[in-house]
Amino acid sequence: MEFSRETRRLALQKMQERDLDLLIIGGGITGAGVALQAAASGLDTGLIEMQDFAQGTSSRSTKLVHGGLRYLKQFDVEVVSDTVSERAVVQQIAPHIPKPDPMLLPVYDEPGSTFSMFRLKVAMDLYDLLAGVSNMPAANKVLTKEEVLKREPDLKQEGLLGGGVYLDFRNNDARLVIENIKRANRDGALIASHVKAEDFLLDDNSKIIGVKARDLLSDQEIIIKAKLVINTTGPWSDEIRQFSHKGQPIHQMRPTKGVHLVVDRQKLPVSQPVYVDTGLNDGRMVFVLPREEKTYFGTTDTDYTGDLEHPQVTQEDVDYLLGVVNNRFPNANVTIDDIESSWAGLRPLLSGNSASDYNGGNSGKVSDDSFDHLVDTVKAYINHEDSREAVEKAIKQVETSTSEKELDPSAVSRGSSFDRDENGLFTLAGGKITDYRKMAEGALTGIIQILKEEFGKSFKLINSKTYPVSGGEINPANVDSEIEAYAQLGTLSGLSMDDARYLANLYGSNAPKVFALTRQLTAAEGLSLAETLSLHYAMDYEMALKPTDYFLRRTNHLLFMRDSLDALIDPVIKEMAKHFEWSDQERVAQEDDLRRVIADNDLSALKGQQEG
């Protein structure tokens, strides 16, 4: 179904003509998940996003559907259980997006190590138990020092004790958002990007009955009426709530900044994802991850109070991450000049909650007796000598023996909250990208109840555990063969097998729609046929309105294909200008915007300071 600039125009027109059941403010993963479930459940749904979809937090993650093994250091079992359960659901409803990737976790004999070899084995066994992983090759494996170095010979050898391998999943975060958005659009939701909420419409009792917004592309004010409004703006949640609390600061959110850096794979060669202690005795771990022909690593985790729209990578961030990777990979000698791209994102953490974080510091202490008892019980369970109930009981004993420490940025809860203010505004905040579906389900359960109680409207919530996102109509047990079948179809449209396979992996069950565009398109000047199809599909079916939307979020060109990016800039802008009938002034403005984003990602300013 078309999802284009014209779709946007019609959506804004219809939003101003209706009294929606639900208006969603925010088009990141949380808002996208709410929109999908609301529209599929029959609610008259609208969604506005002030930037591009996923432009804020949801395209700036570590790009994993992460199981959270790190939580098991302190036996935050409930968190890991929820996370791996939801990860399995995401695999079911978006099978073309998460891809299994065994993660290597080296263990070093040094102060502040997250795991000893023994604790790592216990944690991995518990992790597999919670994830339902029981058979090879997915099951975890303990490695000797020699086996770790055989896998990753460039790792630091000094102090290396061994390691482990466990199952994790890589993710395309921005694609997960847009596929949820597209499905919501197909089910009737009215959706528009680049529309900013500016204030609430209130009735005589100071209850919200809609939103005053501004179309940032035309600078026109828009009035949208809705029975209920939900705030899913992540780091901006407090700002939206502030509309009706003027003069009364709201501090529910405590954003932290996470930075990732990208270098060429030859500069930092890793054959598989690596998750390793920083070696700085700061209680933190970093990921070093291969993607395309690049390697990226991160993340930092620091409190943030700056510009929410444009968080920047600082010299301090770069120094920290380069220090870590050069310590763990001593022969790499990565410098700032090797950095090809980067991103800084804000985590929408909630204030006032303490828990351990998969990248974070130790937030609690487990007594030796509780730990030993849990270890013995898990071992007995694995040997079929004890029950799952016994494991659960031992886990509860560990949880009750845990004492909290003072919060640091990495120990703030990744938990979510769903609140309703006195004026009727719902706010769904916090959480991890893996939890988005469950968060939306909880919110919609409450919203549907309120619609019945306050407005006499009844809806049945869709079973979102089995409701695929756009592109996700693939058998989860047969993903590789179905993707390959789509790729074969692409070759019949004149694509090379490599290009067809790339597009099939990117678009899943929507790949035939992409290939069908060859009936009306030929390769644009300066672009391959595959690139031309991808660009036009993004413009007509994914509401890509700007070059940055295409290069950074509909594809990963700007992050992981930096070598070929420069050659694509002019042809893509030319094709978009032709498609959207841009004036010369608009075309120049779009190119300037793209080059500014590229300069930010390339760290041009920091590199220039060093040269100066």
UniProtKB/Swiss-Prot annotation:
This is Alpha-glycerophosphate oxidase. Residues 398-418 are annotated as: Disordered. NCBIfam families: glycerol3P_ox_1. It catalyses: sn-glycerol 3-phosphate + O2 = dihydroxyacetone phosphate + H2O2. FAD binds at residues 21-49. Residues 398-408 have a biased composition (Basic and acidic residues). Belongs to the FAD-dependent glycerol-3-phosphate dehydrogenase family. Its cofactor is FAD. Gene3D superfamilies: Alpha-glycerophosphate oxidase, cap domain (1.10.8.870), D-Amino Acid Oxidase, subunit A, domain 2 (3.30.9.10), FAD/NAD(P)-binding domain (3.50.50.60). It is an enzyme of class 1 (oxidoreductase). Its EC number is 1.1.3.21. Transmembrane segments: none annotated. One of its GO terms (molecular function) is glycerol-3-phosphate dehydrogenase (quinone) activity. InterPro entries: DAO_C, DAO_C_sf, FAD-dep_OxRdtase, FAD/NAD-bd_sf, G3P_DH_FAD-dep. GO terms for cellular component: cytoplasm. It is found in: Cytoplasm. GO terms for biological process: glycerol metabolic process; glycerol-3-phosphate catabolic process. Keywords: Cytoplasm, FAD, Flavoprotein, Glycerol metabolism, Oxidoreductase.
